[in-house]
Amino acid sequence: LTDVDDKTIRDSRKEGKTLKDFTEYYTEAFFNDCDALNLERPEHVTKATDYVQAMIGFVKTLVDKGYAYERNGSVYFAIEKFQEYGKLVGLEHQDFKTNADGRLQDADEYGKEHVRDFALWKAWTEDDGDVYWDSPWGKGRPGWHIECSVMSTDKLGPTFDLHAGGVDLKFPHHTNEIAQAEAATGEEFAKHWFHVEHLIVEGEKMSKSAGNFYTLRDVLEKGYNGREARYLLLGTHYRSMLNFTFEGLEATRKTLERIDDFLLRLQEADGPDDVSGEAEQAEKAFDEALEDDLNISGALAAMHELMRGVNKKQPSKESARKVLETVYGFDDVLGLGMKDVKRGSLDEKVEKKIKEREEARKKKDWATADKIRDELKGQGIELMDTPDGTRWKKAK
């Protein structure tokens, strides 16, 4: 958690809050959203403000090795000293036309040797208020890029397997992370990079001015739930832009209803057909999709193909259990709460009504059967007549 940077300092002062109070509010909101989406909590959650002394030590190492220099109380990384700078995005040194931090120079950056050098340590200014730490270069605070490199290498070591982030962070942020980390340690920083594409709304970039800016809370307040939002997000490959629409959420809701109905049918199955072969084929297709650049959308397609195949048959109890185990295994990856889908308990009066309707249907007394159906619908119970008998669910 980068709980100290230009934006958090600026916005906390604007709201008249301490940096700690301001960032803790948004940290709590972030984890509330994670819970709503059924995201597992990380093993370690680090805050930049807890690592400032380690960052100062990291910057000193870069200065001592000749990769960084001090100007007017700030410390900058000398890009020209790191020959592999830009390798993540395929840049050559002659391609550097602008400042590597991707912004115009701030007032405290006029002393840089080269316009493309980026700040490792920023000297204190009046705009920082009471946010500063003492360092060998005077009062100041860490730059944004150094925070991530120091925290990740502290918990994972100088080299780790996978570094994730939005596609917009490839340059300059991740590029700068690689440069400062590898210059300091002399080792490869991350073996693999996982860059996630943007989410757009109704085919356009999200923006408050366009009136199409939505948070997860906005979606939940419109009556959708985190499970539906999660499924929608899973449905697009991470390398592809996700076009968010409320029509898409409605379709997702119906898809999840079909999945739940499928699971309930399996739990009650007692037919003649062996569907264990379909389960084995689906497991293979699901795993192959995941091994193909984490193709979750392909894995979902494998699950739906399984549903289509099984729904054409009347599964035996034993093979239905096999299919359930397979789908629950899928859910260990998907996190859609499928193991929690159970038939709710009905009170005796409702159960009696369902049995009465079944008797009426056997006698071909359709008028009575329809009357009971409508009566139960008024109580929030929706009936479904299937080849395996009458099933029910709570109406939306």
Regions found by a protein language model. Give the residues of each.
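Alpha-helical recognition segments enriched in aromatics with Gly/Pro capping
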Residues: L1, F31-N32, Q53-Q267
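N-terminal, positively charged nucleic-acid-binding surface of large information/translation enzymes
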Residues: L1-N38, G389-W392
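Residue-level preference for long, well-ordered alpha-helices that form the structural scaffold
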Residues: E15, L19-T23, Y51, G248, ...
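Non-catalytic interaction-recognition regions
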Residues: K17-L19, T27, F31-G57, Y67, ...
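Short Gly/Ser/Thr- and Asp/Glu-enriched loop/turn motifs at secondary-structure junctions
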Residues: R41, R71-N72, D385-G389
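Aromatic- and histidine-enriched alpha-helix N-cap/loop-to-helix transition segments
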Residues: D50, G143-E147, L294, G298-A301
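Structural preference for alpha-helix termini/caps and helix-kink/transition segments
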Residues: K205-M206, N212-K396
